[in-house]
């Protein structure tokens, strides 16, 4: 393989995003997240970045490198969960996390001035410590200290070069105002004889311990850097990338998505014996729906990790229904009657995701280990979420994944009260899941007859929900009035008749919204709509819709500057508001793009690869077909688009799309060993 193809794809990336803090979890070790500052710099945010998850904020502590070139905007040519390489004029700054220290390797013109600035910002009185204020002091021999009086997390700013000068915040003259965050900072100035310096901001629960960590971080900086770059190379040697005439923000957008997915995979800990999917980086937890979708997305680059995470999620679950849990085994989705809930077979389509993951690897040993867990999961739903007449139900909106959806009307109380509704998507999902299980049993030489019967039963139940040209949820009083894109599920699950498919094919021109939102701004709902369109023969609509969405979302997260009212670039987000890059007023002003660093926000990668680039694998088939549908704007005669390094069953697939003089597409394929 070409050596460049084994490396991270260098480019002009946004200087915004997150470094991975592998020690961060939510019950056993709240360690915080590491987010860019808007300059060349990173900040710890503890216990997480304040937002929809983890609203309680205690402190932030930032290390920023300020070269003497303010007229040049920084960018990154290396942008991964492990390491950011900032460029600003003639300066290069590599930043990464070394245990409990933010490390910066600075390189610039000899003897040019540069500043290292540390800023500690804290909301006193919320941590439970005896924190009454902050202090800043500078030692004559180099270390700068930022700490709390009387107790609390301390930081040390330390470089391996002598100081040319330093300034720091003066001591408090009186008790600070505890109703507002307080701030202290130290700015150290350097004039580097050879233009190189290592500077760190280390933390600990005392200044002395922080100083010891700072010294170790400097001593180990070179080896830590090598380890980080090796990890990046190991991932990217088998990960897809875009080359050629693709839009710049598409080329980089795929990278941001894949790096977000890398970052939400957490190391083993607590009840999880293998790596696990944290769903999002701020307040990690295991949710089957997000795990299945996230790992399907990650399997386009790292199928081995995806397979490990999915299997471990089922194996280490505290109950067959895979309740939503933290790493210590505590549950965090309890209904009003006290039941610990997990997400359903319909939310993010876990069995569909498992089927595609299996087809991508062909790993029958993995399938043999997975199937008993998958059977227990589906058995649980058949035993605990069906009425005596056979109708399935959700116990609560949380279990459906569709919190407070109008489909559930006044019965929805957030945590329960919707048991009387037979949901279309659940019937269809049970039919699909049982059918897939039957197929997997057949491949393993096991009897799958009971799953074939269950699949037929739920397919028949789904058919009975067809009313007035649409699949409607039902109660004892008859069909409900609410329409929702999730009710297209019979198309995605292949349980709709030809007549029903033909009738619904016309619906894609004017889809109903979802829970007060547009039909494609929440990733799982967008996936349901687009895959249903594909199965209904509306592939052109699916491709055009996916391309428009991908273009908009990737343009936003590739922005070179983070401006007020816009989502942070460089990372995937939970939600894709249709208003585009600005947070709208009213309801959207509260929600915006929601959580930063959310795995399913990277579903744009799947939408691009499956519906635009045309990679069509099938959970019920060995086939991989390629049917690209590029948007009209890309069909410029002579343009060439390359999609490289796609893993498929131990090999890497390269695709080249060339636009002919007539505006058509010529496709070339080649394979190499992984």
Please report, for each region that a protein language model flagged, where it lies by residue.
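Aromatic-rich carbohydrate-recognition surfaces in CAZymes
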Residues: 284-400, 423-427, 431, 526-533, ...
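Terminal accessory carbohydrate-recognition/targeting modules of carbohydrate-active enzymes
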Residues: 1-249, 289, 300-301, 535-541, ...
């Amino acid at each position: 393989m070409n050596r460049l193809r084994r490396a991270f794809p260098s480019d002009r990336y946004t200087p915004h995003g997150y470094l991975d803090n592998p020690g961060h979890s939510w019950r056993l070790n709240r360690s915080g997240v590491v987010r860019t500052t808007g300059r060349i710099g990173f900040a710890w945010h503890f216990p997480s970045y304040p937002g929809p998850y983890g609203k309680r904020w205690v402190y932030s502590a930032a290390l920023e490198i300020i070269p003497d070139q303010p007229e040049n905007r920084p960018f990154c040519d290396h942008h991964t969960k492990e390491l950011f390489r900032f460029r600003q004029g003639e300066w290069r700054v590599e930043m990464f996390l070394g245990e409990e220290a933010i490390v910066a390797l600075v390189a610039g013109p000899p003897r040019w001035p540069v500043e290292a600035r540390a800023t500690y910002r804290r909301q006193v009185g919320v941590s439970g410590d005896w924190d009454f204020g902050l202090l800043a002091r500078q030692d004559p021999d180099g270390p700068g200290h930022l700490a709390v009086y009387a107790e609390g997390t301390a930081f040390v700013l330390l470089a391996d070069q002598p100081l040319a000068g330093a300034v720091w915040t003066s001591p408090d003259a009186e008790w600070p105002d505890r109703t507002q965050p307080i701030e202290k900072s130290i700015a150290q100035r350097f004039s580097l004889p050879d233009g190189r310096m290592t500077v760190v901001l280390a933390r600990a629960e005392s200044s002395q311990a922080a100083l010891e960590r700072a010294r170790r971080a400097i001593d180990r900086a070179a080896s830590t850097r090598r380890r980080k770059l090796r990890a990046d190379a190991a991932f990217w040697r088998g990960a897809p990338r875009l080359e050629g005439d693709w839009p710049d923000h598409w080329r980089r957008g795929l990278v941001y998505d894949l790096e977000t997915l890398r970052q939400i995979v957490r190391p083993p800990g607590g009840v999880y014996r293998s790596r696990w999917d944290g769903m999002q980086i701020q307040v990690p937890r295991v949710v089957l729906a997000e795990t299945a979708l996230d790992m399907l997305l990650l399997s386009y680059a790292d199928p081995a990790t995806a397979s490990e995470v999915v299997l471990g999620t089922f194996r280490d679950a505290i109950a067959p229904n895979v309740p939503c849990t933290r790493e210590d085994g505590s549950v965090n989705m309890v209904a009003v009657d006290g039941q610990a809930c997990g997400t359903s077979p319909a939310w993010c389509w876990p069995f569909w995701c498992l089927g595609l993951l299996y087809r991508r690897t062909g790993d029958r040993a993995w399938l043999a280990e997975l199937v008993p867990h998958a059977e227990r999961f589906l058995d649980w739903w058949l035993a605990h979420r069906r009425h005596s007449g056979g109708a399935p139900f959700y116990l609560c909106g949380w279990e459906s994944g569709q919190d407070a959806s109008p489909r559930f009307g006044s019965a929805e109380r957030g945590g329960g009260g919707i048991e009387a509704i037979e949901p279309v998507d659940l019937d269809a999902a049970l039919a699909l899941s049982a059918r897939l299980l039957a197929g997997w049993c057949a491949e393993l030489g096991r009897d799958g007859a009971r799953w074939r019967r269950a699949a037929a039963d739920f397919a028949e139940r789904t058919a009975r929900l067809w009313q007035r040209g649409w699949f409607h949820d039902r109660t004892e009083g008859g069909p409900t009035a609410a329409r929702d894109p999730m009710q297209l599920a019979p198309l995605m699950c292949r349980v709709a008749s030809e007549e029903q498919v033909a009738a619904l094919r016309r619906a894609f021109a004017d889809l109903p919204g979802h829970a007060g939102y547009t039909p494609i701004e929440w990733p799982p709902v967008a996936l349901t709509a687009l895959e249903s369109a594909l199965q209904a023969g509306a592939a052109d609509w699916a491709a055009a819709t996916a391309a428009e969405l991908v273009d908009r979302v990737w343009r936003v997260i590739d922005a070179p500057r983070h401006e007020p009212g816009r989502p942070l670039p460089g990372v995937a987000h939970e939600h894709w508001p249709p208003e585009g890059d600005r947070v709208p007023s009213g309801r959207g002003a509260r929600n915006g793009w929601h959580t930063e660093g959310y795995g399913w926000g990277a579903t744009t990668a799947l939408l691009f690869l499956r519906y635009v680039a045309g990679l069509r694998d099938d959970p019920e088939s060995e086939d991989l077909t390629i049917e690209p549908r590029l948007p009209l704007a890309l069909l410029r005669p002579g343009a060439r688009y390359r999609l490289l390094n796609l893993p498929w069953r131990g090999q890497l697939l390269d695709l080249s799309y060339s636009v002919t003089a007539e505006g058509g597409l010529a496709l070339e394929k080649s394979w190499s060993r992984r």
